Structure formats: structure tokens, C-alpha cells
Design a protein with these regions (language model features):
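Basic DNA-binding region of bZIP-type proteins
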Residues: 67
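Mobile "lid/hinge" segments at catalytic clefts and subdomain interfaces of large enzymes
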Residues: 361-363
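Short hydrophobic/aromatic patches on beta-strands that form ligand-binding or substrate-lining surfaces
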Residues: 1-11, 62-64
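A generic local secondary-structure boundary/capping motif
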Residues: 258, 358-359
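Beta-rich carbohydrate-recognition and catalytic domains
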Residues: 16, 23-28, 34-55, 59-60, ...
Length: 400
């Protein structure tokens, strides 16, 4: 069902609902300057609720799609949610009390957006606003551009009944002053997608790949998926690609794949998960010759001392040293080695001082880390930190 429900705020307070079989299917109430629209689904007893400030004379639209619902006030998107299962409200259902409400079929805009949607100045402390915050960041360098993919967060990780319903947004810069906003890189397009989790970017033979896991919870293994692009701005999901980690790992919590190509000619993937038998968090290590078929390397590249899962792994070679990065309880730690994939040791101070779960990319000879500063919950504002290295590999941090 793709439906558009439209009405005008002609009086306050306002209330109407639709119900059948003794159960509310859709409910709208507005008072004290706030409107709440609740939609019920067969997936969960609790409804999904959209909210916005409201006043007399405002024109309201509620858009119901199978994978997303939206609340517009006077043509501006004020809130959105991402359902699962089937909406109990159907076209043709009535409302009580009777009032002037328009219900019609709704067609999504299928036009391809331009590669640059808008621009803004200075990303330090930036977030999109209007209820949208920055989550985990995934930076990479392409030629002379520094790109940041980040998790779009509404409701402080509370969307989709707490699954998060995160999607990947995309910005870039050439000077860290003016930033370009690009089309959404990975969107939720299926109600079976609970959240597009953190991942990584890689280029191969002129094609750009984004690897991530799709989480749905309820004991369902999280598959590793990917999206591809020929221009670096418009990504399409590869419906033919996907796999889950082996049973020695906790499959439901597998996430945050970091993919790199190494000197051995192989592609390596590191994933956040846990060893089931040992009950210890770890970074699983997978390898591939072609980025199509992946095999377990045999042992994790890192195992925690306890059940804490090392999140958002990063890996790179910089100034003659190999670096393995991961976050514990939101704080990023780095390890150093002279050899790839082994022999990593933590320096005396292993913390990367860039707030929550930062990852890095080399730019103009320095490592530039991107993280986010929380604002009132999970999501927040983007933040950066630059770093160079000492001869022993220890990083020296400075403000960007």
C-alpha cells in the first residue's frame, strides 16, 4: 500500500482514528502545539509514531509506504519512520469522528537526484538538523577529495522499534571548508531491513563498493551486503551478493565490515562480532580473491579480553606501519604493527581523541579521523581530529 492521507488543522485540539476488528489501526491527535500520528503494524504491538509541532491552518500529509512512513507539515518533511510487516490501515478504511480527510494513492518520485544536492560550510560540529543527527562515520579519500559516509539517525537510535533504521548519507570536501551533500548512498528500501549498519568503502576496477550488514534482530543472522556505483554518487544494491559469518561467531550481531586490498593480492574483511564458545568479542577475519566469494581466514585478527565487542574496525598502512583500529564502549583504540594482520600492540596511550567511534583516511600526508559528538542520546554532530606519526608509529593528534 502506497497511501497519502491529507488534512488541514482547522481546530485544536484535534483527534481522529481508524479501527477495525476491535483494534486501532491509525490514530492522529494534536494539542498543545504538537501533533502525533500513530500507525499500527502486524509486526509489533506498539505503533510507529510520527511527531511535529503544529498550529492552526497547517496542512498535514502522512505518507504510508511499505518501507517508510513520512509526516509533512506545509510541504516540509518533519518526521519519518521505517516499518516492518503489514500496516493494519488500508485504503478505503474510514475515520471517526468524521472530518474532511483525503486518502489517495501515492507514487514515489523515481527521478535520479543530481550528484551534488546542496553545499554547506564547515563540518566541525555539523549535523543535518530538523530531527536528524550524525551517527557512525566512515571516511575515505578519493583523489583529492575527502569523503564521509555517515549513519543518518532519527529518534536517537529509537527508530523502527529500537532497531535504529539507519541509512547511509554522503558528503565530501576538497578543503575542509566547503562541503558537498550527495544523494543518500544506502537507503532502507525493504521492510525486512531493520538497519543499514556501519561498514566501509572500496574501489575495484573503476567500480565503487560499499559493504555493510543489514540488521533485523530477533535472532536473525545479519547478512553482509553491498551496494555498487559507477560514478561514486549513485549507489545501487547488489541483490546477488550476500553471506553470513560462520557459526563459530555470533551471527546476529555481526556488523561493521571493513574491506581492504592487501599486498598479498587478496581482499580482507574485518567484522565486529563475538566468538560463541569463548564468549569473547572479536574482529572476525575473512578473505577473498575477487570480493565475490569470502572465506573465514581461520582466526580473528583481534579477540577481546571479555565479552565486549570491538566496534567499527579500521585498518590501514601509514608511514611504514600497519594500524588496526576499533572502538570499545565508543572510544577508539589503535594498535601498531610492522607486519600486516599480526603482531599488533597497543601504545602506552591507545585512545584516538575524536569522540565516538572515529575512523580515518589519509589526506595530504596526515590521517584525518572523523567521529561524532553525541547530543542528548546516540546521534550527534560530526567532529574531526588530525594525526601524524612518530618513528615508532605512535600517533600525535592535533585539531584539524
Amino acid at each position: 500500500m502506497n497511501a497519502r492521507i491529507a488534512f488541514e488543522i482547522n481546530e485544536l485540539p484535534l483527534f481522529f482514528l481508524s479501527h477495525k476488528n476491535g483494534r486501532k489501526t491509525l490514530e492522529v491527535e494534536a494539542f498543545d502545539g504538537l501533533l502525533a500520528a500513530s500507525v499500527q503494524y502486524d509486526y509489533e504491538r506498539r505503533p510507529l509514531t510520527l511527531k511535529s509541532e503544529i498550529k492552526l491552518g497547517d496542512k498535514v500529509e502522512i505518507i504510508l509506504l511499505s518501507h517508510r512512513i513520512e509526516l509533512y507539515v506545509n510541504g516540509t518533511l518533519m518526521d519519518e519512520e521505517w516499518p516492518a510487516g503489514k500496516a493494519l490501515f488500508e485504503m478505503g478504511d474510514g475515520f471517526v469522528p468524521e472530518m474532511q480527510i483525503s486518502v489517495s494513492e501515492y507514487a514515489e518520485d523515481g527521478a535520479t537526484p543530481p550528484s551534488v544536492v546542496s553545499t554547506f560550510e564547515n563540518a566541525e560540529g555539523w549535523y543535518p538538523g530538523n530531527g536528524v543527527f550524525v551517527g557512525d562515520c566512515m571516511p575515505y579519500r578519493r583523489a583529492d577529495e575527502y569523503h564521509v559516509l555517515y549513519l543518518k539517525d532519527r529518534h536517537q537510535h529509537g527508530s523502527k522499534w529500537g532497531l535504529g533504521a539507519h541509512q547511509w548519507e554522503h558528503i565530501s570536501t576538497r578543503d575542509f571548508k566547503t562541503w558537498k551533500v550527495h544523494p543518500m548512498a544506502v537507503a532502507i528500501t525493504d521492510p525486512r531491513e531493520g538497519s543499514i549498519c556501519t561498514g566501509s568503502w572500496i574501489e575495484k576496477d573503476g567500480i565503487e563498493y560499499l559493504h555493510y550488514t543489514v540488521r533485523m534482530g530477533r535472532g536473525i543472522p545479519a547478512p553482509i551486503r553491498r551496494s555498487v556505483s559507477t560514478d561514486g554518487y549513485h549507489f545501487v544494491k547488489d541483490e546477488n551478493f550476500g553471506f553470513t559469518v560462520s557459526e563459530q561467531y555470533h551471527r546476529e550481531s555481526a556488523r561493521d565490515p571493513k574491506v581492504i586490498k592487501a599486498e598479498d593480492g587478496l581482499y580482507h574483511m574485518f567484522l565486529t562480532t563475538s566468538l560463541v564458545k569463548e564468549n569473547k568479542g572479536c574482529l572476525a577475519h575473512y578473505v577473498s580473491r575477487d570480493m565475490e566469494s569470502w572465506e573465514d581466514f581461520g582466526a580473528p585478527i583481534y579477540v577481546s579480553a571479555d565479552a565486549t565487542q570491538p566496534e567499527c574496525p579500521d585498518y590501514f598502512f601509514y608511514n611504514g606501519k600497519y594500524y588496526l583500529i576499533f572502538s570499545l564502549h565508543g572510544k577508539a583504540h589503535y594498535m601498531i604493527s610492522d607486519k600486516p594482520f599480526e603482531g599488533f600492540v597497543m601504545p602506552e596511550d591507545p585512545i584516538i581523541p575524536c569522540r565516538s567511534v572515529p575512523k580515518g583516511a589519509e589526506w595530504n600526508g596526515k590521517l584525518i579521523f572523523t567521529g561524532f559528538r553525541r547530543i542528548g542520546g546516540y546521534g550527534g554532530a560530526m567532529t574531526f581530529k588530525a594525526a601524524t606519526s612518530k618513528e615508532n608509529g605512535e600517533l600525535v593528534f592535533e585539531d584539524l
